[in-house]
Amino acid sequence: MAKAKFERTKPHVNIGTIGHVDHGKTTLTAAISRVLSERLPSNTNVKQDFDAIDSAPEERQRGITINISHIEYETEKRHYAHVDAPGHADYIKNMITGAAQMDGAILVVAATDGAMAQTREHVLLAKQVGVPYLLVALNKADMVSDEEILELVELEVRELLSTHGFDGENVPVVRVSGLKALEGDQKWGDAVMELMKAVDESIPDPVRDRDKPFLMPIEDVFTITGRGTVVTGRAERGVLAVNSEVEIVGIRPTQKTTVTGIEMFRKQLDEAWAGENCGLLLRGTKREDVERGQVVVKPGSVTPHTKFEGKAYILSKDEGGRHNPFYSNYRPQFYFRTTDVTGVITLPEGTEMVMPGDTISITVDLIQPIAMEEGLGFAIREGGRTVGAGTVVKILE
């Protein structure tokens, strides 16, 4: 069967549902899918039922297995990819490894319970790993008849968001009932449409990868006799034109060069675009001047660093991780983009050790500099096997 062509007529936005266990994230996701499929029928808006979303397929991201569901739908304004993870651990792993980069998220809070422990944990994580916008779905609102209670829960959630650096005062809070909307109730179907209108309006259009400064991690280096050195990789973002000046950053001192040719599938190109696998011919660069693990970037856009604060999830023994805890001064490899660099971990004050299965904040000192930005993901490896994964939260030096 031929794959449906992806129509680029609307802006594309990645979102997800976050929040405490059993507050109705998956039910609400299914309700959004149902209501949109009925009210805005299209090829994209195909109803996904609860079970299909709940039995999330396994994905591997930086060596960690995560159960995660992806569904797509569209409003009149936009096309959305929506991620939902069934278990709490899957959420944490998803957010820390950036398995699904979110442009914004719907925080689901049950009106019957208010904000709970995992609500707080997800909001904190969303801030740390750089989810830029949240809005609130006050779910199970059909089960609370007292207006005062609804207002109190809303106030509490707004305060929680403000505490963690979100704009709690102005965040949209929409009262919904995922279950009632899923059962076809007209009033609660309207509430889902109101929620989607709030998503359309409060989560800004993301900056497309193509509009960001060019970056390509080097995967391989070749010499082409008579022409020079070619580096290959997949352009992560930006657009690069032939004869542009670039910098090669990481591992060694930063060097400037000019890209004199761009090739993809043995064809000459004028430009390399985000998402494309290409070879870049570098002027006056020797084969031994560059190596896997460095990145080719727009000059001045990314700098090399060795010390950072990160947030990491350490695999449990059952997930193929370590069998015993580790302590400060643990020296694993940190896998950034295409290469491993040894680093020394310092644990936060008051944390003696880290057990397999823990989520932690760490300070890391790398023995070689890496082209680094906040939000960059990494795997933690020991002798080639993954024992954890994380995200750079703050660059120190």
From Swiss-Prot:
Residues 139-142 are annotated as: G4. This is Elongation factor Tu. The keyword Protein biosynthesis applies. Residues 63-67 are annotated as: G2. Keywords: Cytoplasm, Elongation factor, GTP-binding, Hydrolase, Magnesium, Metal-binding, Nucleotide-binding, Protein biosynthesis. The keyword Iron-sulfur does not apply. It is found in: Cytoplasm. InterPro entries: EF-Tu_GTP-bd, EF-Tu_GTPase, EFTu-like_2, EFTU_2, G_TR_CS, P-loop_NTPase, Small_GTP-bd, T_Tr_GTP-bd_dom. Residues 177-179 are annotated as: G5. Residues 84-87 are annotated as: G3. Its main location: cytoplasm. Its EC number is 3.6.5.3. GO terms for molecular function: GTP binding; GTPase activity; translation elongation factor activity. The gene is tuf. It is an enzyme of class 3 (hydrolase). Residues 10-207 form the tr-type G domain. GTP hydrolase that promotes the GTP-dependent binding of aminoacyl-tRNA to the A-site of ribosomes during protein biosynthesis. Residues 19-26 are annotated as: G1. Monomer. It comes from the Bacteria. It catalyses: GTP + H2O = GDP + phosphate + H(+). Belongs to the TRAFAC class translation factor GTPase superfamily. Classic translation factor GTPase family. EF-Tu/EF-1A subfamily. It comes from Tropheryma whipplei (strain TW08/27).
